[in-house]
Each structure stands twice: as structure tokens, then as C-alpha cells.
Amino acid sequence: MKSSIRQKLELLVDRLDEIDRMLSAPSTASDMDQFRKLSRERAEVEPVVVQFNAFRQAENDLAEAEAMLSDPDMREFAEEEMAAAKARLPELELELQKLLLPKDPNDERSVLLEIRAGTGGDESALFAGSLFRMYSRFAERQRWQVEVMSASESELGGYREIICRIAGNGAYSRLKFESGGHRVQRVPETETQGRIHTSACTVAVMPEVDEVEDVNLNPADLRIDTFRASGAGGQHINKTDSAVRITHLPTGIVAECQDGRSQHANKASALKVLAARIKDVQVRAQQAHISSTRKSLIGSGDRSERIRTYNFPQGRITDHRINLTLYKIAAIMDGDMDELLGALAAEHQADLLAELAEQN
């Protein structure tokens, strides 16, 4: 283990002792904010210290076994103990490195998922519907809630655009690698000659902002327009200007919602989408800066960047970022995304570990 990493770990051991002393102090017990803050920190530090203690125990076991080699009666036992300790140490060190990786502050958040039809006309809109179903089925498997916030349906089915909220702990950590261009190759239902068509959709995954106030939205910077809703949502909404469009004038970012039952509900939904989009722009700017200095699996923040191809005739899905091809397209489109998302998360973790090694 590198000395710089060991020093960090030894500091964390001392910090855990300090936290325990502070938590047991009467002054902390009477200050609930401080108590909660220290308790959260302890929950983050303790697993690292426990793992480091296991690593140090394996080091001690190895040293004791090496000391026994000079005893002929203990030599065979010592060699077995040495082999076991040497096998255990790299595993423990890797787990420690993973625990030391910086955590994405948005990982535990719910998400706003936006799917837009791109090139390919009606087939692209149908594919947007297929993608929405895929993510919805995946969310159901995680016991997450899916709420459609805004949808623009196409004439033949599917969506020109759909925005939904997926609520559940860790939703962003699982879905954040989905942002980008998704290309499909298949024979459309409207195709009479059996020719394969290529079309595309863009997906944006944005961490939900806890409160709209988390993003500094000055009311003077907002233009709010109302208009008559169209499409799904009930015929009664066409009689009033219940649909809402909000424009953030400094950035030109727009959000509109018309699926709610009232203007008030649509305004609240549009504000939530607008806040998430503004925060997403900020996050993507950070990602662009990061990707200029090192490889970033999430990408440069360019939504048009093609990340995945869905080839239905061949039954395969290829993720171009990690050169992974899976021949299980039916299962994945039905929400069985664990293998795909797990491979992306593992690659991202490997990138972070490589960066940690460079820093140390």
C-alpha cells in the first residue's frame, strides 16, 4: 500500500476516535444538528476504518507467519498462513481504495428523465416510447415510482418528447450513465418492404433538486406563459389556459407542463423541471471541464454523443463507451438492465481508481 494512502487511513482512524468522543459529550447530546452531522460522518468513516483494521490484521498475520518459517515444526503451517495472507491483502486493499473514492453528492437523489425523439420521424417517436417503457420497467423492478410530468405523443404512438420523475433512493447512481444519444436499427411497423431503418433519440438524466430554492431562481428572471393544453389529460383542460411554460431569461432554458389537472399543478411541475435543467447545465459544465483533463464515462455533457446502439434484427445492444455488446435485447427492453448498468458502473469505478492512483 502506498504511504500516502496509509496516512489518509490512519488519519481516519484518529478521526473516528474523535467523533466517538464528541458524540458521547453532553454538549453534543443537547445539540441535535451537531449530533446528526457527526452521526452522518461516523456512518461514512466507520466502514473504512473497519476495512483498514482487517487489512492491518492481515499484515500482522503475514509477519507472524514469516517469523515462524525458521521453526521446522511450524514451517508447513507458516507457509499456508503466508499464502492466505498474501491472497487476502490485495483484495482488502482494493476494497479500501473503493471506499476512499469520492462520492457523487447526487447519487442518492431521485431523477428527472427526459427522452426526445430525434432523427427518424415516426419511428424515432416509437423508439422513444420503447425507451420509456424500458426505464419504467427497470424502475418497477427497483420498487421506484414513475410519474409522467410532461408528454407530447406522436400520431402513430410513442412520444416526440416525454419527461418523467423516477423517485427512489439511488436512482441517479444507477441511471446517470444513460444520458446521450441512443440509436435504434429495426424494421418499423409501418415498413412494408422489410427494410431496416435507423433512427435515434436523446436521453437526459438529471438529478432532482430537493427544493426549487436550491437553484437560485430570481422571479424577475422568469417569464411565465399560460396556454390551452392539448392531448392527454382530459377534455376539460382544453377549456382553460391550464398549461404552463416557464422561460429562464438569463439562460434561455424553457420548461413546460400541461399534464396536470390545474394551472397551479402545471406551474409547480414546470418549476421543478426548470430547476433540474438549470442544475443539469451546471453539472454538465463541470463534466466538460473534467473530461478535458481525463476520461469521463459520463461524457463531456454533449447530449448528442452516441452512447448506445439497439440492433433488433441481430438481437443485440452495444454500448460504445465500454465496447460492451449484449445479445439479450428483449430482456433489456423489458427492464432487465442490471448487467448493462453494472458494467458501466464498474468501468466508472475503475476510472476513478486509476485517477486515485495517479494522485497518490
Swiss-Prot record:
Gene3D superfamilies: 3.30.160.20, 3.30.70.1660, 6.10.140.1950
GO cellular component term of the entry, any: cytoplasm
PROSITE patterns: RF_PROK_I
Keywords assigned by UniProt, alphabetized: Cytoplasm, Methylation, Protein biosynthesis
Localization (cell): Cytoplasm
Listed Pfam families: PCRF, RF-1
Post-translational modification: Methylated by PrmC. Methylation increases the termination efficiency of RF1.
Family membership noted in the UniProt record: Belongs to the prokaryotic/mitochondrial release factor family.
Source species taxonomy: Bacteria, Pseudomonadati, Pseudomonadota, Betaproteobacteria, Rhodocyclales
Function of the protein: Peptide chain release factor 1 directs the termination of translation in response to the peptide chain termination codons UAG and UAA.
Entry-annotated residues carrying N5-methylglutamine: Q235
Name of the molecule in the record: Peptide chain release factor 1
GO MF assignments: translation release factor activity, codon specific
